[in-house]
């Protein structure tokens, strides 16, 4: 009798694992489809590319050397960066070793930034849907891309992983939204664990991303309340 019970539990566990894998693939597929939606829209693609060229074209082709750039080897070869708690860029440099090259690093940085901004547009589209046209999302993307607070970092220091961190936080917020959909059940662990992992990696780039994540989650809670979306509302 115990053998049959154990087999049933084992089969149930396998079924749960398969179901979790299917759900995770479905969530990732939805994010990719929404990501493609923006870049298949001409006004969004043209707006982001044009804003990138206008905002960073001169900086990219005429790089400056800051004090942190002169200490590139100390940060990413000798281990000062992980000692500061910023271990992700150090790890990336070990996996993909690259000498100091402002143009190449800056170009990669801007491509990653474009991806990160698109993921934030996906976050807002999950909240607003068609209530905001693609022109509204394009305007948001262009403003974020050309923000002086962020662009200043590109001028002085292109190796800090800030742009990648923004994308990881956006993904963490998306998975947090999925956790809200599940409610307080055993299934909540499926999306919340990836969210925690992504948040941890983002903090490895820059510890201030904790504030970005918390503010984003608070913003999501406020928008859910204001928009009264049925899929996120809890039953009394």
Predicted regions and their residues:
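Short hydrophobic/aromatic helix or loop-helix immediately within or flanking a transmembrane segment
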Residues: 79-107, 111
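Transmembrane signal-anchor helices characteristic of membrane glycosylation enzymes that use polyprenol
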Residues: 36-66
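Membrane-interface micro-motifs in multi-pass membrane enzymes
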Residues: 82-86, 112, 132-180, 204-209, ...
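Short, Lys/Arg-rich, polar N-terminal cytosolic tail immediately upstream
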Residues: 3-4, 17-37
């Amino acid at each position: 009798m115990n053998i049959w019970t154990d087999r049933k539990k084992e089969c149930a566990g396998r079924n749960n694992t398969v179901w979790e894998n299917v759900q995770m693939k479905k969530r990732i597929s939805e994010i990719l489809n929404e990501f493609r939606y923006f870049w298949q829209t001409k006004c969004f693609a043209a707006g982001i590319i044009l804003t990138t060229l206008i905002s960073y074209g001169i900086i990219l082709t005429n790089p400056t050397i800051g004090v942190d750039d002169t200490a590139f080897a100390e940060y990413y070869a000798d281990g000062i960066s992980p000692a500061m708690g910023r271990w992700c860029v150090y790890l990336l440099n070990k996996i993909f070793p690259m000498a100091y090259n402002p143009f190449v690093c800056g170009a990669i940085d801007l491509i990653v930034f474009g991806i990160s901004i698109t993921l934030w547009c996906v976050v807002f589209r999950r909240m607003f849907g068609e209530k905001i046209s693609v022109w509204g999302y394009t305007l948001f993307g262009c403003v974020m891309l050309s923000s002086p607070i962020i662009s200043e970092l590109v001028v002085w220091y292109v190796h800090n992983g800030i742009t990648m961190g923004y994308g990881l936080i956006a993904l963490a917020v998306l998975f947090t939204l999925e956790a809200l959909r599940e409610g307080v059940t055993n299934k909540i662990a499926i999306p919340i664990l990836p969210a925690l992992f992504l948040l941890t990696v983002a903090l490895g780039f820059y510890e201030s991303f904790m504030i970005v994540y918390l503010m984003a989650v608070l913003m999501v809670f406020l928008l859910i309340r204001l928009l009264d979306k049925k899929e996120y509302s809890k039953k009394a």
